[in-house]
Amino acid sequence: FVLGERGGQRAIVDPAIRDEEGFNLLKDKVEEIRDDGSDILCTIFTHRHQDHLGDMGLISQIYQAPVWGSEETLSALPEISETRRLSEGDIVSVDGPTGRSDWEVMETPGHCPGQICLVGDPGVVAADNCTMVGTILVPSSDGDMGAYISGLEKLRSLSPHTLFVGHGPLIPNPERTLTQYIEHRKARHNKVLEAVRSGCSTLRDIAISAYSDTPGANPALAEDQALSHL
């Protein structure tokens, strides 16, 4: 995503290029930004997963700018010297021909430690909290299911009119989608609890019981998500 107006400051969010196709797409976009007289203020990363960070070596061949992100995200980029640490309530301001655009940082660390969203008048840059199709993985390795559900509720409380998500198309009028996500995760949480109470004692058996309504689910992912709920 690119924040800001044509001819003003621009912030590039999650460029995440890792191959030639991505390189060419970003290169074309940056050329378009520069052609309209804009300056690139910074690169903002919503979280530290590689599908959002991309290859910094490739990115730096196209443009150089300070990197902004949470402490956890910046710790994954030790080679970057010019940085700004973002945390809850911080304001990202980009100046443009018609005025200043402000985006408030909101922490939603459930999917990944240090994940942030950016809340502005056009909507919310919502990182990996939800998507139009399917569900979002909350890795048992470093995710936090309770924090993830709380983050969804936090997003819903804003009553945003658009979510700009990390995967798939933007979500217009997202209250319904957020409610579905919250209800789905809470229901799955209860099914995991029921599996334990019924006597299931291995992760495999808990996952089979908790995901009995989706027999086609990938067994490894089902076990990982069951562990996250546990």
Name these PLM-found stretches.
Residues 1-32, 117-129:
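Conserved beta-strand hairpin/beta-sheet module of binuclear metal-dependent hydrolase folds
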Residues 19-20, 48-54, 74-77, 112-115, ...:
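Active-site environment of divalent metal-dependent phosphoester hydrolases
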Residues 134-142:
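Surface-exposed cleft-lining segments at the edges of enzyme active sites
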Residues 17-101:
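Active-site HxH/HxHxD metal-binding segment of metal-dependent hydrolases
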Residues 145-199:
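Divalent-metal (often Zn2+) His-rich catalytic cores of metallo-beta-lactamase-fold enzymes
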Residues 194-230:
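C-terminal regulatory/interaction regions
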Residues 2, 91-119:
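Core dinuclear metal-dependent hydrolase active-site scaffold
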Residues 13-15, 39-49, 67-71, 107-110, ...:
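Active-site neighborhood of phospho(di)ester-bond hydrolases with catalytic His/Asp-centered motifs
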